[in-house]
Amino acid sequence: MHNDYLKQVKSYLMSLQDAICQQLAQADGEQSFQEDSWDRPGGGGGRSRIMKNGAVFEQGGVGFSHVYGEKMPASATAHRPELEGRDFNACGVSLVMHPENPMVPTVHMNVRFFIAQKEGEEPVWWFGGGFDLTPFYPFDQDIIEWHQQAKNALDSVDEKLYPEYKAWCDDYFFLKHRDEARGVGGIFFDDLNDRSFDECFSVIKAVGDAFTKAYLPIVERRKNLAYTQQQRDFQLYRRGRYVEFNLVWDRGTLFGLQTGGRTESILMSMPPLARWEYNWQAEPGSAEEQLTEYYLKPRDWLSV
C-alpha cells in the first residue's frame, strides 16, 4: 500500500514536469528545455531540464528528482527526531525561471513528497510545496491575480488552507540577515500529513496544476514592455538577494547538498547573472525604493 503512495506521487510529478516545460517553452517562443538525466550514487536520480537564452527566459530550470537512502539527512531530522534510523524516499518537482526583462517577475514553484520507513513500524510520510513570486518592478494586478489563483487552488481542497499557507510563505521566504522579504509571496507548506493520504495528495496536485495558470498570464502581459539599462542593473542587484536566500536559508537546497544530491541540479535555481553593490541605496520616491518599502512587506493582497 505504502509503495503505491510513492508510485502515485512519482507518476503525477513526472507528468507535471512534462506539462510545465511544454507550457513555459510555448510562452518563451524561442527556446525549449534541454534534458539532463542523472543518477545518484547513493540511490535514485532525476531529470533536470534547463532553458537558456530564450526570448523571455534568460535562464531557468524545471527539475524532477527521486532520491532514496538508508539514513535521513540532518536537515530533515533536525525538527523531526523520530525519523532517526529510518530509510527514506524523497521525490519532487522544483523550478525557478529567471526572465531577462525586469518587468517580468522571477518565479519559483516546488511540490514534494517524503516517506520514511523502518521495519515493523508505520511509515512516516508528508508532503510539502508551494509557489512564490519575486518581481523587480511590481504591478498590483499581477500580484493580486497571483494570490487569487493560489487561493482558488487551495479552496478546491479546503478554504482554511490559503490564509495559513500564505502566512507561512511570508515567513519562510524572508532574508533574516537583510530583514526583508524575498518577494511578494504566494503559498508555502511543509510536513503536510494531518489528513488522509488522498486528501494531502490532492493539495499538491492543486498547487502543481495551478502554477502555469497563475504565472503565464503575468508573463504575457509584461514580456514586451520596454526597460532601461538602469532597470536591468537593478534586476541584477535584486537577483543577488535570491542567491543569498537560496544559499543561506533554503531548506531544500540544504537537504539536497546534505543528501549527496546532484550539485548542478540543486543549484540550477541560480540566476545566470547577479550583482552586489556595497551599501546601495534607492533614490527616495523611486520605483526601486517602492519595491522594498511597500511591496516587500507582507500584506493581504486580496483585500488591497
Curated annotation (Swiss-Prot):
GO biological process, one term: protoporphyrinogen IX biosynthetic process
Catalytic activity reported: coproporphyrinogen III + O2 + 2 H(+) = protoporphyrinogen IX + 2 CO2 + 2 H2O
InterPro entries: Coprogen_oxidase_aer, Coprogen_oxidase_aer_sf, Coprogen_oxidase_CS
GO CC list: cytoplasm
Enzyme class: oxidoreductase
Main location group: cytoplasm
Catalytic residues (UniProt): 108
Cellular localisation: Cytoplasm
Residues marked Important for dimerization (site): 177
Assembly and interaction partners: Homodimer.
PANTHER family listed in its UniProt record: COPROPORPHYRINOGEN III OXIDASE, MITOCHONDRIAL (PTHR10755), OXYGEN-DEPENDENT COPROPORPHYRINOGEN-III OXIDASE, MITOCHONDRIAL (PTHR10755:SF0)
Stated family: Belongs to the aerobic coproporphyrinogen-III oxidase family.
Protein name listed in UniProt: Oxygen-dependent coproporphyrinogen-III oxidase
Protein source organism: Idiomarina loihiensis (strain ATCC BAA-735 / DSM 15497 / L2-TR)
